[in-house]
């Protein structure tokens, strides 16, 4: 599910912005059924977007994407579940090419499968990627996108070393 409060775009400036964005898995009766992550973002700004490629080819092609104040909560899978997740197929034409992808003032939390234990936190981080590409060749890789260069800065982090 994707929701947002405000969407602005300018064809003349080739820009698009979303405010107060929330991402979550489809509704489910149990946290273990579907939730792998939830996310909230204060603002997403896309500059130099090619609207023709976006509409016609379903390809996001832009000069830069700035993601401001994201909060991501990730839930580990239950270790008892030995069923391997099926790799999802991507339609040819679903592509993402961006010169600069910047994540500013982010926070990441890692939780146990049921969400009862807080296992890790990384706060106040910035990640800057250059030459980001996502396509049918990268979707099934461990890191499902390619990049030319990246830089990470962070303020603080904690990890639970022993879960027992």
What is each model feature region?
Residues 3-60, 68-70, 137-143, 149-164:
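N-terminal beta-strand/beta-hairpin edge segment
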């Amino acid at each position: 599910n994707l929701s947002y409060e405000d969407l602005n775009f300018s064809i003349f400036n080739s820009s698009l912005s979303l405010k107060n964005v929330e991402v979550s898995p489809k509704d489910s009766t149990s946290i273990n059924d579907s939730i792998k992550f939830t996310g909230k973002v204060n603002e997403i700004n896309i500059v130099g977007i090619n609207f023709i490629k976006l509409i016609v080819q379903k390809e996001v092609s832009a000069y830069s994407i700035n993601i401001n104040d994201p909060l991501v909560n990730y839930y580990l899978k239950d270790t008892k579940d030995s069923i391997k997740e099926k790799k999802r197929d991507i339609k040819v034409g679903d592509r993402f090419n961006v010169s600069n992808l910047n994540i500013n003032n982010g926070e990441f939390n890692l939780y146990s499968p049921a969400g009862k234990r807080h296992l890790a936190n990384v706060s106040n981080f910035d990640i800057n990627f250059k030459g980001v590409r996502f396509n049918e060749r990268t979707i099934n890789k461990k890191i499902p996108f390619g990049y030319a260069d990246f830089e990470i800065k962070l303020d603080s982090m904690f990890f639970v070393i022993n879960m027992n």
